[in-house]
């Protein structure tokens, strides 16, 4: 048995122990308070209540900042709601059809099901007998959350002095006053990026993965800017092996037209850099407009593998050309999420809020009633921090084609004049683990 197989077996046993511990009533007497005013009411809250109490008891942290506990509870709510919502709506519908719900209207019937059925732990156990995968997924989710939050707390304590020295300008801190942990997709057993606001007014970014790639990316960016008339701006990155900390980069507008021109000159350089590194997925969420500097805050998708297409039709021929061009990175305008000639621009240079996705996603309708059901809607894009602005006003990038072109040309010329040193510099990317983006490019035309 390999080490990985052994770890998987051990993990499965621990998740099973979570389920068995839940059956004993562990955590039932835990007291907690939800900030309903901030988060809004929760659907099927009596069902969630069982697992919030259990999750708090299992975390078993006596000294934990209030905002971290709030974040932990919020994650339990979001993840278990996502796992269980469809099943609970279906079971409520069955109870209604069998005449088991009491009430004069659909709202009262929902309240009855939520209170009398989901508040009864015996009923919860009956659901688990019918849906064993539901049980498995719920306790697996809690298991990962517990491990990930404990891991963060241990690392924050261990690295305290180093964070003060490197990211806090030597300003000491005692606690975290705000935590945001829903800013990225989760990977590798629920691990996700978090932004921590400390009581010294400094924000730090925690990433539960190696940041060797980010450090190499910034080092390479500094190297390329040697041939530029403008220097690149990097941000502080602390790589701790299998996790790391970063300086928080906040967007800000340009204060004059020259700064805006400088931004797009640097953007041209950025296009060249990511073309060389065969980077992709650098969409609007992964680039911050920091004054006259475009800052890539997630370089996890560099060094993408080239997937050879069969080129049996025009679509595959077009996709092959896109993959081999500067469009592949996602920095320049491109339309995604539709293969019918329509789509939305999610590029770092142009992606903006308010656009309607040309795809349908499920949303719950008639919330808080026994008629709850899924309906499919077109979601609307929300704002990001990728657009360069002048005193808060966005000016179309087409106005600055000359600057973009010049930045690209200067960086290209530097690379061509320093081929051997560039090849040597590329060795900093050896043995770096990157994220492979496997989306079908054909779906994005």
Regions found by a protein language model. Give the residues of each.
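Long, C-terminal catalytic modules of enzymes
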Residues: 399, 403-413, 417-433
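Eukaryote-biased recognition of long, low-complexity, charge-rich segments
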Residues: 338-391, 396, 400
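Conserved kinase catalytic-core segment
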Residues: 248-350
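Conserved small/polar residues in nucleotide/adenosyl-binding loops
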Residues: 437-445
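General beta-strand recognition
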Residues: 205, 245, 295, 354, ...
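Short His/Asp/Glu-rich catalytic/ion-coordination signatures at enzyme active sites or charged loops
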Residues: 126-141
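Non-catalytic protein-protein interaction scaffold segments in large eukaryotic complex-forming proteins
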Residues: 1-86, 440
């Amino acid at each position: 048995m390999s080490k990985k197989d052994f770890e998987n077996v051990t993990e499965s046993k621990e998740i099973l122990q979570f389920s068995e511990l839940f059956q004993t009533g562990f955590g039932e007497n835990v007291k907690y308070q939800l900030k309903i005013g901030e988060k809004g009411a929760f659907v099927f809250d009596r069902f969630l209540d069982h697992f919030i109490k259990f999750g708090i008891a299992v975390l078993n942290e006596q000294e934990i900042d209030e905002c971290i506990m709030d974040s932990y509870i919020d994650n339990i709510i979001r993840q278990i709601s996502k796992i269980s919502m469809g099943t609970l709506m279906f079971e409520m519908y069955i109870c209604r059809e069998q005449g088991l719900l009491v009430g004069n209207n659909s709202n009262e019937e929902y309240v009855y099901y939520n209170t009398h059925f989901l508040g009864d732990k015996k009923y919860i156990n009956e659901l688990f007998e019918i849906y064993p995968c539901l049980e498995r997924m719920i306790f697996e989710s809690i298991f990962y959350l517990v491990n990930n939050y404990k891991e963060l707390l241990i690392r924050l304590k261990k690295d305290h002095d180093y964070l003060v020295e490197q990211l806090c300008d030597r300003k000491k801190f005692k606690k975290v006053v705000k935590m945001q942990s829903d800013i990225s997709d989760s990977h590798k057993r629920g691990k996700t990026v978090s932004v921590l606001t400390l009581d010294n007014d400094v924000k730090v970014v925690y990433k539960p993965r190696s940041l060797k790639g980010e450090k190499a990316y910034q080092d390479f960016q500094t190297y390329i800017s040697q041939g530029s008339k403008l220097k690149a701006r990097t941000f502080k990155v602390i790589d701790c092996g299998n996790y790391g900390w970063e300086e928080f980069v906040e967007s800000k507008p340009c204060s004059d037209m020259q700064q805006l021109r400088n931004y797009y000159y640097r953007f041209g350089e950025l296009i060249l850099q990511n073309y060389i590194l065969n980077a992709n997925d650098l969409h609007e969420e992964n680039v911050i407009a920091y004054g006259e500097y475009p800052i890539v805050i997630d370089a996890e998708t560099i060094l993408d593998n080239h997937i050879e297409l069969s080129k049996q039709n025009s679509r595959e021929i077009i996709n092959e050309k896109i993959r081999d061009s500067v469009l592949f990175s996602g920095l320049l305008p491109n339309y995604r999420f539709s293969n019918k000639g329509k789509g939305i621009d999610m590029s770092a240079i142009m992606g903006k809020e308010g656009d309607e996705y040309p795809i349908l996603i499920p949303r719950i309708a008639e919330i808080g009633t026994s008629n709850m059901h899924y309906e499919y809607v077109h979601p609307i894009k929300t704002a990001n921090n990728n657009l360069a602005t002048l005193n808060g006003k966005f000016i179309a990038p087409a106005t600055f084609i000359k600057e973009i072109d010049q930045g690209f040309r200067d960086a290209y010329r530097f690379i061509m004049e320093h081929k051997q040193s560039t090849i040597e510099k590329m060795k900093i990317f050896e043995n770096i683990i990157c994220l492979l983006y496997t989306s079908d490019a054909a779906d994005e035309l």
